[in-house]
Amino acid sequence: SALGRPYVWGASGPGAFDCSGLMQWAWGRAGVGLPRTSQAQAGAGQRVPLSQARPGDLVTYRSDASHVGMYVGGGQVIHAPHPGAAVRYESVHMLPINSVTRP
């Protein structure tokens, strides 16, 4: 239900999101609490190799884990990309992958 919502830095839904806010909101709807930042989310569970990623796993990007998306299967993630862009699906390989975490 977040697909197409605008990116707003610091927003955690439901009308707008930043990348980590989207992950926090989505997992929160499933009753799982996540930390607020992508860096903290990268450490909020079990690390798994990309080859074992399942829908719902968090994929963090760049060496500083400054971006995060949610794996949805089929080599795709859903994420809130950047200001001026809406929440969308994109290839899991859109940026250099830092880690895959299963909350």
For each of these PLM feature ranges, what is it?
Residues 2-55:
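Catalytic cysteine-centered active-site loop
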Residues 32, 43, 47-51, 66, ...:
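Aromatic- and glycine-rich peptidoglycan recognition patches
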Residues 6, 12-15, 71, 75, ...:
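Gly/Ser/Thr-rich beta-alpha loop segments that engage phosphate groups in nucleotides
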